[in-house]
């Protein structure tokens, strides 16, 4: 086999590598993902005089914002305490959140023309439309260069001869960019239809980051029982408890439970779901208990059911 040594040298010679880099677009700050976090990051960088490029693989920015709060977007909460965050290392999370707390969040959007509406601590835009928040952030990105329907496929770290990080080569489905700094706000795996499909984890792991196996952390429960079809549409204030297979209480919460055709949902369910998800990820057999009538004792409930049976003998009281 013959090899053209001249051509080979021309390809790998440092001067040619530099020439290749010159042909790539140079970007001071490249943000991967144009969701809520990406838009906020871009707005903050622009306010400080940064030149920003945002790469978003969907056809619009902030698509997941539009689905938040059933289309109303509760963008912060006035009731915040460290114990509200069901995560490992909640103290560290709390410290980070205090750096840009609910007061600063409300002030940020109010100055941009979005006035808050308080609903029992949940803060919505006064219009009660998520699009108000999305458009507000969009206006702050007027000076950013935004690429739609372009997906990042790889990131390579540029290391100098002295071992110093000099930037990143970002490869996409359409081009290559030489970025001085990158901010990855690509989301997790929560909503593939909105762009969060988890592909970024592979790229981040390649760069040396530790990736904890992702599991659903805010989700509803699909139940195997057939009677759930009969309770679809019912909402009730109750208590839900999550247990491990050894009957140890993992978490509990109370509030409005939303009963759907194939299971159970609602904020209390979301609050305990991460514990069940993590147990299932470890191939264990956790379970839940639901108290639909916490104001009744077992004896009182039994007497109430007997009373109803006497008053309505033809009415079904069980499934």
Please identify what each model-predicted range represents:
Residues 181-227:
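Glycine-rich loop(s) and the adjacent beta-strand/alpha-helix scaffold that form part
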Residues 2-15:
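N-terminal amphipathic/hydrophobic targeting modules at extreme N-termini
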Residues 66-99:
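N-terminal glycine-rich dinucleotide-binding loop that anchors FAD/FMN and/or NAD(P) in oxidoreductases
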Residues 47-48, 60, 81, 98, ...:
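Residue-level recognition of phosphate/Mg2+-coordinating polar/acidic sites
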Residues 46-70:
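Glycine-rich FAD pyrophosphate-binding loop
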Residues 99-181:
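Feature captures the FAD/FMN-dependent oxidoreductase FAD-binding
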Residues 27-54:
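N-terminal Rossmann-like FAD-binding beta1-loop-alpha1 element of flavoenzymes
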Residues 30-32, 55, 152, 177-192, ...:
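Short hydrophobic core segments
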């Amino acid at each position: 086999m013959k090899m053209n040594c001249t051509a080979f040298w021309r390809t790998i010679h440092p001067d040619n590598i530099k020439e290749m880099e010159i042909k790539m677009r140079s970007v001071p700050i490249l943000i991967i993902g144009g969701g809520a976090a990406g838009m906020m990051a871009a707005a903050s960088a622009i306010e400080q005089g940064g030149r920003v490029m945002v790469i978003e693989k969907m056809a619009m920015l902030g698509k997941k914002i539009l689905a938040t709060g059933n289309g109303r977007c509760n963008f912060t909460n006035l009731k915040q305490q460290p114990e509200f965050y069901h995560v490992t290392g909640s103290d560290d999370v709390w410290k980070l959140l205090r750096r840009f707390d609910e007061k600063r969040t409300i002030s940020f959007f109010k100055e941009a023309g979005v006035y808050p509406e308080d609903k029992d601590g949940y803060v919505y835009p006064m219009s009660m439309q998520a699009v108000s928040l999305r458009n507000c952030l969009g206006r702050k990105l007027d000076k950013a260069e935004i690429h739609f329907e372009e997906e990042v496929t790889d990131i390579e770290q540029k290391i100098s001869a002295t071992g110093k990080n000099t930037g990143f080569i970002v490869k996409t489905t359409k081009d290559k960019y030489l970025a001085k700094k990158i901010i990855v706000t690509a989301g997790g795996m929560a909503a593939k239809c909105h762009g969060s499909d988890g592909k970024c984890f592979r790229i981040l792991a390649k760069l040396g980051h530790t990736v904890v196996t992702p599991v659903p952390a805010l989700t509803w429960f699909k139940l195997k029982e057939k009677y759930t079809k009969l309770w679809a549409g019912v909402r009730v204030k109750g208590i839900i408890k999550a247990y491990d297979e050894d009957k140890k209480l993992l978490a509990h919460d109370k509030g409005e439970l939303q009963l759907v055709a194939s299971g159970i949902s609602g904020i209390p369910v979301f609050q305990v779901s991460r514990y069940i998800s993590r147990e299932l990820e470890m191939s264990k057999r956790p379970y839940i208990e639901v108290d639909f009538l916490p104001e009744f004792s077992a004896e009182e409930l039994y007497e109430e059911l007997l009373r109803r049976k006497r008053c309505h003998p033809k009415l079904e009281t069980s499934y």
